[in-house]
């Protein structure tokens, strides 16, 4: 893994690695550290995905080399792995740091959010609700930070912060119109999406064919088991 990271970094490629569990996180960070030691690159924005069970010391090392984190906040309330089950397997201390969003933000890491759909509900506002209602109070984040996780931060992680991710003159006009303010609404996950605009034009959903209906049915069957 170190050899791969060193080679890709030398070529100027942005690297993204999955890391679930503290051992996997250790392998991943060690590989990135080896790559940066071989060729320093301040603006690489290399990424770790998931980053479950990372220790604070590991996250400090990630912050030192400016890694970005691609988290999946809906796993915080994933009913396939309830808190009682996780505690029985991992213990309370490790369970509490499964998705350490608060620690990541306090250390200055850039964190983007996703759903890992269809494993969890593919709805950004649902993820935002999970982020601000983490069962461990120390790992909860502010609504504004959670909003950035689904807007500006992913754009930065893909080197597109000058094109998308915020509503500003000159940016690509991809945005949604919401029925309420996610920074103040009582039920973030329940906010209705009133409209979707792509490149400044209102998007109208086309009639779904048989394949689309089947895909939606499968996703609904998978995801309805884990809704909070």
Name these PLM-found stretches:
Residues 6-16, 23-46, 51, 56, ...:
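His/Asp/Glu-enriched, well-ordered alpha-helical/loop segment
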Residues 10, 178, 219-228:
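C-terminal regulatory/interaction regions
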Residues 68:
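Ligand-binding beta-strand-loop-alpha-helix segment within the catalytic cores
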Residues 182-186, 212:
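Short, charged/polar, Gly/Pro-enriched secondary-structure boundary elements
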Residues 205-224:
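Glycine- and charge-enriched low-complexity intrinsically disordered segments
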Residues 1-12, 213-215:
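Active-site-adjacent helix-turn-beta-strand microarchitecture at beta-sheet edges
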Residues 187-208:
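P-loop/Walker A phosphate-binding loop and immediately adjacent motor/lid segment at beta-alpha junctions
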């Amino acid at each position: 893994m170190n050899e791969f990271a060193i080679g890709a970094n030398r070529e100027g490629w942005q690297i993204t690695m999955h890391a679930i569990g503290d051992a996997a996180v250790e392998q991943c960070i060690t590989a990135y550290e080896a790559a940066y030691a071989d060729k320093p690159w301040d603006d690489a924005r290399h990424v770790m995905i998931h980053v479950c069970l990372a220790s604070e010391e590991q996250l400090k090392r990630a912050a030192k080399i400016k890694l970005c984190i691609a988290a999946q906040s809906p796993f915080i309330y994933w009913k396939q792995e309830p808190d009682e089950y996780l505690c029985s397997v991992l213990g309370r201390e490790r369970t509490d740091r499964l998705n350490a969003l608060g620690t990541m933000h306090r250390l200055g890491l850039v964190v983007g959010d996703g759903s890992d759909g269809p494993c969890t509900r593919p709805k950004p506002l649902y993820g935002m609700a999970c982020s601000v209602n983490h069962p461990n109070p120390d790992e909860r984040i502010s609504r504004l930070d959670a909003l950035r996780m689904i807007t500006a931060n992913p754009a930065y992680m893909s080197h597109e912060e000058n094109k998308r991710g915020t509503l500003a003159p000159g940016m690509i006009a991809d945005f949604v119109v919401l029925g309420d303010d996610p920074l103040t609404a009582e039920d973030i996950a329940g906010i209705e999406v009133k409209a979707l605009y792509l490149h400044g034009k209102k998007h109208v959903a086309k009639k779904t064919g048989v394949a689309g209906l089947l895909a939606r049915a499968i996703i609904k069957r998978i995801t309805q088991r884990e809704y909070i």
